[in-house]
């Protein structure tokens, strides 16, 4: 967390994820997982930090996975495998997208192969 806040303060929010991935030596054996409602849009200056991270991942031949709420964003258009949450009601795009993302996140952190410490419940 301290690195994220320091990078944001020193370099700006737009490059915070890409700069961290660069420092972490992102390469063709890696993947990034994007959780976003809109997925980013450089032209409209929305979530450009996500766009920059995806651009870096693609330049390094890393895979890009995503779970998003809209098929019109940068993640949906440029990701290798992207789940776009279907929206029956446009007013619910954010809560439905974030709810599904939370389910996936909980499954990932609860998987026995990924647990460092067992949960109590």
Residue spans of the language-model regions?
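Glycine-rich phosphate-binding loops that contact phosphosugars or nucleotide phosphates
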Residues: 1-121
């Amino acid at each position: 967390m301290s690195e994220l806040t320091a990078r944001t303060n020193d370099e700006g929010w737009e490059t915070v994820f890409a700069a961290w991935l660069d420092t972490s030596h992102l390469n063709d054996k890696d993947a990034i997982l994007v959780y976003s409602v809109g997925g980013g849009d450089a032209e409209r200056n929305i979530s450009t930090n996500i766009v920059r991270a995806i651009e870096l991942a693609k330049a390094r031949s890393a895979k890009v996975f995503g779970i998003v709420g809209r098929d019109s964003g940068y993640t949906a258009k440029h990701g290798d495998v992207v789940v776009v949450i279907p929206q029956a009601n446009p007013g619910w795009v954010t809560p439905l997208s974030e709810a599904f993302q939370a389910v996936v996140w909980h499954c990932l952190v609860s998987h026995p192969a990924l647990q460092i410490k067992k949960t109590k419940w």
